[in-house]
From Swiss-Prot:
Source species taxonomy: Eukaryota, Metazoa, Chordata, Craniata, Vertebrata
Modified residues (Phosphoserine): S5
Keyword Phosphoprotein appears in the UniProt entry: yes
Coiled coil: 86-130
Keywords assigned by UniProt, alphabetized: Acetylation, Coiled coil, Phosphoprotein
Protein's name in the database: Coiled-coil domain-containing protein 50
Post-translational modification: Phosphorylated on tyrosine residues.
CC terms in the record's Gene Ontology section: cytoplasm; microtubule cytoskeleton
The organism of origin for this protein: Rattus norvegicus (Rat)
Biological process, per Gene Ontology: sensory perception of sound
Length: 305
């Protein structure tokens, strides 16, 4: 095999070749680090966007739950108001019926009193009519008494029995009036007791409903607060985990870059151009990395100039 002749005057120096190799290696490492940084930035942006979307969904869900709770409260308020209106209307109807019944009873009592008064006037007129007859009869009765030896006359008996009958009728009417008034007072007291009990029951129902609504509202607020705290805690944990992961990833990448980076060969001792072995230089150059021979020669020639 014929020996290949190499023009030693066009070959670059060893230091220049090592420097060019180091520059190329630095460029490669910088490009790799830049790509890793871009990938990390894109990954962090994707994670941040996902977290924002999750937070928006949670906030929307909480808002919907709050709106539902408010709608339920308004519905309960309306139902309670309607119930109160129905109770008030029922009480008003009862009061109206009671007032009408009382008015009718008063009218009946007035009619009865008027009739009794008319009867009393008629009885009074009858008594006035019987009074002269009683006077005339007393004289004849006296004569009859003295003649018959102590027998009572018929006029005296009628005069004594007529006031007794009138007095007995007045007593019955007075007793009936007292009984009616007592019955009215008893009915009124019973109605007042029923109304007071109904009002107390309505107040108790309203108080219980208000307490239940306050409890439900407080429970909804506590649930919303706990959800917000949990979301904030999850966000902090994710942020801490993300920062720790990024730091560990950067440390691993830096360590890997340091491990993967080959050590630079020590600069060779200065030799005379005539002592340079072309075969030794060719072997060393092929062991490190295969560069373009024409490019290296061109760079070395340019540096010499």
């Amino acid at each position: 095999m014929a020996d290949v002749s190499v023009d030693q005057s066009k070959l670059p120096g060893v230091k220049e070749v090592c420097r060019d190799f180091a520059v190329l290696e630095d460029h490669t490492l910088a490009h790799s680090l830049q790509e890793q940084e871009i990938e990390h930035h894109l990954a962090s942006n994707i994670q941040r966007n996902r977290l924002v979307q999750h937070d928006l969904q949670v906030a929307k869900q909480l808002q919907e739950e709050d709106l539902k709770a408010q709608a339920q409260l308004q519905k309960r308020y309306k139902a309670l108001e309607q119930h109160d209106c129905e109770i008030a209307q029922e009480i008003q109807e009862k009061l109206t019926i009671e007032a009408e019944r009382r008015r009718i009873q008063e009218k009946k009592d007035e009619d009865i009193a008027r009739l009794l008064q008319e009867k009393e006037l008629q009885e009074e007129k009858k008594r006035k009519k019987h009074t002269p007859e009683f006077s005339g009869g007393s004289a004849s009765g006296d004569n009859y008494y003295y003649e018959d030896g102590g027998m009572k006359s018929r006029g005296i008996n009628e005069a004594v029995s007529a006031p007794a009958r009138v007095s007995h009728r007045d007593q019955e009417w007075y007793d009936a009036e007292i009984a009616r008034k007592l019955q009215e007072e008893e009915l009124l007291a019973t109605h007042m007791d029923i109304r007071a009990a109904q009002v107390a029951q309505d107040e108790e129902i309203a108080r219980l409903l208000m307490a239940e609504e306050k409890k439900a509202y407080k429970k909804a607020k506590d649930r919303e607060k706990s959800s917000l705290d949990k979301r904030k805690h999850d966000y902090d944990c994710k942020s801490k985990a993300k920062s720790a992961h990024s730091k560990s990833k950067e440390g691993d990448e830096t360590q890997r870059a340091k491990i993967d980076r080959p050590s630079r060969p020590p600069p060779p001792a200065a030799m005379a151009p005539e002592d340079v072995d072309p075969t030794h230089f060719t072997n060393q150059h092929s062991n490190t990395r295969h560069f373009s021979k024409s490019e290296s020669s061109h760079k070395g020639f340019h540096n010499k100039q």
